[in-house]
Amino acid sequence: MATSAAVRDDEPATKFAKDQLKSIIERIERLEEEKKAISDDIRDVYAESKGNGYDVKALRTIVRMRKQDPNERAEAETILETYMQALGMI
């Protein structure tokens, strides 16, 4: 009988844990949907820019570069330039 009493004592905690888990899963699912919608919007903007004659690859590169820290970007550009000079590309 002690076992059944212990199970009854755990039921509210178990229900809380189940509700909390369900809430977490639903939040993740909602965020995944939002992420997909944003991804679709970004793809549409790139398609629009391509339709207007812009080079999408260059745009993606610029977006990636703008995300970088200016010092890190400068360092990467210096290294790239050094390598290109060593290969006689510039």
From Swiss-Prot:
Entry superkingdom: Bacteria
Single GO term (MF): DNA binding
NCBIfam families for the chain: PRK13694.1 (NF010247)
Family: Belongs to the UPF0335 family.
HAMAP family in alphabetical order: UPF0335
Alphabetical list of InterPro entries matching this protein: GapR-like, GapR-like_DNA-bd
Protein name from the UniProt record: UPF0335 protein bsl7135
Positions of disulphide bridges: none
